[in-house]
Amino acid sequence: MFTNLTTVAYVHAESRESTILNDVLNGFTGVLVSDFYTAYDSVPCAQQKCLIHLMRDINEDLYKSPFDEDLKEIARRFGALLREIVETVDSHGLKARGLGKHKKAATGFIEHVGAMKCQAEAGLALQKRIAKNRDKLFTFLDYDGVPWNNNNAEHAVRAFTRLRNTIGTSTPKGHREYATLLSIQQTLRYRGMSFLEFMRSGRMEIDSGSGR
């Protein structure tokens, strides 16, 4: 499933292999916003990892390892940095001009974490994770309109889950047909348009004659 702020595309595949990602995203020159699934690393484009996923994982680690001081230090610094960034987004939107002021702090956070002498397992694992993804955590600071999370994708996944629970099992052909219909329905929803009216109109393209 692939989405941006106005369009959703569900692609039926037997697995989440990286070859499928590269086929779908061949020639893509934008910024890919994703979770930390390793197959995305093979896509040759700028990338932004979902910071909500990272924060959730950090909170889960804190719950499991409440006495890991290194982990708490990383969590504190990351939380403070993210709060400042979100405040800017809330006030000025996803604009590189406004977000650029946080680049120094973001670089400082990554460098500080990299220099830490982590001892316990949880803190050390998080340190390595941040080091591995250091070039993909704050990419959005350099671009207009690139979100720092993949909430749109999460919403689109829930829409597919509801459909799957309703229809139950199906053939691969059926899954492809459902994926096409759901892509149309969700794209129309993102654009504030009626699925029923669009289907009745006989139009073959969503933008055709819509003025949107």
Question: For each predicted feature, which ranges?
Answer:
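Catalytic center-proximal scaffold of phosphoryl-transfer enzymes
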Residues: 1-212
